[in-house]
Amino acid sequence: MRLTKREQEKMMISLAGMIAEKRKDRGLKLNQPEAVALITSRLLEGARDGKTVGELMNEGATWLTKDDVMEGIPEMIPMIQVEATFPDGTKLITVTDPIR
């Protein structure tokens, strides 16, 4: 299987997101890379599912709460930005204060 660099990055984000989802489901508090991976992978999947940038910006701030992550993590992630492929092209999704 031959993947471009971008495809490899997407695959790594998806894998890290799946691991973070499993840890969250087991009741573990997520660290910074896990929290970013979970939100980023959900944003990419939402774009693939046909959601709009606006919908994803709003939803992205609801997936994790302060109770889901280790102490100090919300302050470490003031914003998440990811380029996602939508049916009409690639767009930048920005989620401000993603962990509330």
Swiss-Prot record:
Its EC number is 3.5.1.5. Pathway: Nitrogen metabolism; urea degradation; CO(2) and NH(3) from urea (urease route): step 1/1. InterPro entries: Urease_gamma (IPR012010), Urease_gamma/gamma-beta_su (IPR002026), Urease_gamma_sf (IPR036463), Urease_subunit (IPR050069). Its main location: cytoplasm. It is found in: Cytoplasm. It holds the Pfam family Urease_gamma. HAMAP family: Urease_gamma. NCBIfam families: PRK13241.1, urease_gam. Belongs to the urease gamma subunit family. This is Urease subunit gamma. It comes from Limosilactobacillus fermentum. The lineage of its organism: Bacteria, Bacillati, Bacillota, Bacilli, Lactobacillales.
